[in-house]
């Protein structure tokens, strides 16, 4: 597993505003989208490209274009939806799939899958999983293995913040027969008794969309 923790003044500034409990949902959504666009630069560093002959107004040349089959962006519902615009802004030609998962509150590292909208065959596709929080790591491991069971061999996970416990769980449990990377804006102190990241930013889904009882 490759872990990339981004270090940039813009990311640090935006992440601080994002964490502030007084930041309204509208601003929170904008910041999530902006942070993901900044993360996308590093996350797509290994994006596969092919030669593309073109003509400029001055002369012919051979440039590059994203290879086919197109990469697929997979937000983990519901909080991952808040990251989607930031990714599609950078890769408008990418396909989008959806994966619905929620934490089993009695067993925090176990997940319940309640929805999916993905191609049956992901062989040869570069997959980008997006989920704001890497807390226990259970969601990320389950989601990645779900993609691998459909043939994926190249998965990049993009999260905003992570806990050391979650990173360790992913390292120990992700299957080895895959190219797997994790890109995050920051790694926090750890998890509290409820498996929330500390200091964290609260429940990302609630702050994006409001609490649903």
From Swiss-Prot:
Molecular function in Gene Ontology: GTP binding; magnesium ion binding; uracil phosphoribosyltransferase activity
Family annotation (Pfam families): UPRTase
Cofactor notes: Binds 1 Mg(2+) ion per subunit. The magnesium is bound as Mg-PRPP.
Binding residues annotated for uracil, in chain numbering: 197, 202-204
UniProt keyword terms in alphabetical order: Allosteric enzyme, Glycosyltransferase, GTP-binding, Magnesium, Nucleotide-binding, Transferase
Pathway, per record: Pyrimidine metabolism; UMP biosynthesis via salvage pathway; UMP from uracil: step 1/1
Family under the similarity heading: Belongs to the UPRTase family.
Name the UniProt record assigns to this protein: Uracil phosphoribosyltransferase
Protein species of origin: Bifidobacterium animalis subsp. lactis (strain AD011)
């Amino acid at each position: 597993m490759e872990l990339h923790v981004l270090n940039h003044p813009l990311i640090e500034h935006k992440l601080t505003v994002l964490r502030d409990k007084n930041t309204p949902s509208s601003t929170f959504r904008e910041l999530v989208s902006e942070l993901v666009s900044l993360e996308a630069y590093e996350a797509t560093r290994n994006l596969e490209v092919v030669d593309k002959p073109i003509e400029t107004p001055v002369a012919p040349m051979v440039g590059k274009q994203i290879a086919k089959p197109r990469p697929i962006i997979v937000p983990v519902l519901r909080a991952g939806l808040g990251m989607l615009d930031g990714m599609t802004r950078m890769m408008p030609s990418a396909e989008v799939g959806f994966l619905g998962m929620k934490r089993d509150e009695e067993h925090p590292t176990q997940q319940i899958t309640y929805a999916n909208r993905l191609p049956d065959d992901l062989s040869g596709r570069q997959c980008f999983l997006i989920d704001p929080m890497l807390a226990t790591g259970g969601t990320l491991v389950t989601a990645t293995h779900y993609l691998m069971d459909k043939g994926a061999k190249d998965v990049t996970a993009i999260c905003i913040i992570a806990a050391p416990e979650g990173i360790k769980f992913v390292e120990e449990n992700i299957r080895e027969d895959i190219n797997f990377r994790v890109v995050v804006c920051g790694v926090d102190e750890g998890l509290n008794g409820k498996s929330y990241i500390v200091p964290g930013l609260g429940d990302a889904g609630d702050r994006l969309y409001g609490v649903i009882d």
